[in-house]
Structure formats: C-alpha cells, structure tokens
Amino acid sequence: KELRERLSGDVDDHLLHGAVRFGTERTMEQDPTFSFRIVVDIALKALSPAINDPTTAVQAIDQIEDLLRRLGAHDLDAGYGYDGDSVLRLIFPMPAWEDYLVLAFDEIRHYGADSVQVVRRLRSALVGLTNSVTDDTRIGAVQRYLKQLDLTVDRSILTADDQETARQEDRQGLGL
C-alpha cells in the first residue's frame, strides 16, 4: 500500500494504547535522563546550606559516573520505533552525550564549587570518563568539561592552596 493509505484513517484506540504509554510520572525505563535527574537532585540536596553533606554528594557522583560509563558505550542517535513487521514507524530525538554531561554535572559543579571534596570527585569522574569512553567526540566533550571545571575552581572562594588541591583528582572524594 501507499504510505498515505497506511497512515490515513481512524486510529484503533486499543492499538494506540498498546503502543504508547501514558502516565502521570516519568520512569527510568522510558526516560533515561530521569535517572540522572534523581541522582543529581540527591547531590544538590546534600550540598544545600541546610544539609551541608558533601560526602553524600560524592556518593551521588559515584553513581552518576557509573551511569555515564554505561551510557558511553551506547549509540545516542535518534530513537527508532518499529511495528510488529519491523517497519520503521517513529523517529524521536534523543539527548546527545553533551546533554547528559550538562545534566549530570552542571548544577553539582555550580553548587559544589566551594567544596574541595566535591570538586576533586567531579574531576576524578571526568578523568575516568576520558579513559572509559572510546568515541573521540565524547572524549573531547569531557575534556572541554574538565576545562569548565578548572574555570569554576578559579572563580571559587577557595584559598590558593585549596584551589591547587581541587585541581587534583580524588576517586574517593576525601578532599584532603
């Protein structure tokens, strides 16, 4: 049949509801950015002045790094939806690698800029990603983000000694 004929006509509600999920909440299975958002929110709450718990923020960064390492092994081009006959029916945009880096680290970098512990763990996560991601474009994005982290340290209220320490990666985020 012609494409126009196949795409015209009434929509079977039963088939539509079987193909598309409707709900009031985002899920990790349907929206990969949601997983990052949850963990980033944990880190941000830990970094808030009322809580002031950089260790919890570091633990959140551990999880974010793990998510990014796993994601780095996957193709992040457009998403494709096929019908039961393997006919392409839907193409939908997916976040790019840089979008995930921004989501994962921007707010933590901003709100954790004055914590040597947090900055060192962020640096370690980024260096770890440059070693685990194989795509040159993605490695370049991580290296650009490392430069952004250096600029953040330069503008922070940390003392010169603390800034020097913050430029050294620390996998455990001890801040020493």
Task: Say what each PLM segment does.
Residues 3-176:
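Short basic (Lys/Arg) and small-residue
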